[in-house]
Amino acid sequence: MDNLSYWKMEETDDWHGFKGIAKDEAIISPLKLTVVCPGINLETGKYEETGIPGKVIGEYLTEKRVITCKSDLYSTLFLLTPGERDADLEALLTSFLEFEEYYLRDALLEQVLPRLVKQNPERYQGYTIRQLCQEMH
């Protein structure tokens, strides 16, 4: 991966959303991983009918002891290091798959975010993960 061309962002590419960048002005960091959550149409910039806010994903991962760098409206950023082990990345992927399963079956919030429910029982008792996501969306 010594070839810098793998990481260059070109103005003609539409996947990154940057307009007007000069040639060789911007590169992607191979040590940053941004996961984009559903909720905003990336082409139009408009909200979709449903969404999963990045803060919800970030809180879930924190409860699973997976450290995020930051969570925005509909994305979560991870900073990887050269020392990351396969087991660390596997734990991240497994956590995402578990969250997806909880979301698809609309699990109770006390299963998905038990700490949040414990801190605010009267507010979140009986809530489901989709209810929380939709309310924040």
Regions inferred by a protein language model and the residue ranges of each:
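Non-catalytic terminal extensions of PLP-dependent enzymes
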Residues: 1-137
